[in-house]
């Protein structure tokens, strides 16, 4: 009895294709997708008349997953502006990468920008927040500890 493992983070999006392409472009792998609806789905969500598309993507090592969800019903008419990085609640995910600067350049070429600036932190990580589709914030982290030691 008790927790076995961390399974996934759910992310609600308006454009499932764009969100999926963004995360696949960062190295996630598509695991599968489906449409969900019905009484059980309504009860789980605490909403009536739910119909949603779900796409699961996972890290290459299979230890982390994102559940990308596009709700077709019911409508959500309350749309806040993209939240700043310090707004309380789940705000970003972090993925470890190689060659962070090249990834940032590619993301900029694809129309995405950083929230702040690339910074080396405590000679251990090179870090940056990137704003993806629909204002999602993804932190990129490159381990530079071994780079600094050589």
PLM region spans:
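N-terminal beta-strand motif that seeds the catalytic metal site of vicinal oxygen chelate
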Residues: 1-20, 29-32, 90-95, 144-150
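Exposed loop/turn and edge beta-strand positions of beta-sandwich/beta-sheet ligand-binding modules
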Residues: 5, 50-51, 89, 124
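Amide-forming acyltransferase catalytic core, primarily the GNAT-like/NAT-type
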Residues: 56, 73-74
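Short glycine/proline- and charge-enriched loop/turn segments
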Residues: 84-87
């Amino acid at each position: 009895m008790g927790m076995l493992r961390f399974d996934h983070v759910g992310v609600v999006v308006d454009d499932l294709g764009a969100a999926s392409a963004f995360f696949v472009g960062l190295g996630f792998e598509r695991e599968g997708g489906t449409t969900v609806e019905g009484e059980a789905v309504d009860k789980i969500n605490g909403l009536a008349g739910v119909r949603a598309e779900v796409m699961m993507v996972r890290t290459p090592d299979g230890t982390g997953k994102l559940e990308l969800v596009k709700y077709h019903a019911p409508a959500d008419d309350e749309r806040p502006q993209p939240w700043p990085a310090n707004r309380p609640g789940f705000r970003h995910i972090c993925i470890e990468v190689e060659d962070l600067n090249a990834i940032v350049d590619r993301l900029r070429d694809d129309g995405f920008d950083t929230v702040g600036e690339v910074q080396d932190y405590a000679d251990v990580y090179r870090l940056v927040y990137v704003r993806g589709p629909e204002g999602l914030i993804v932190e990129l982290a490159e381990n530079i500890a071994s780079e600094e030691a050589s």
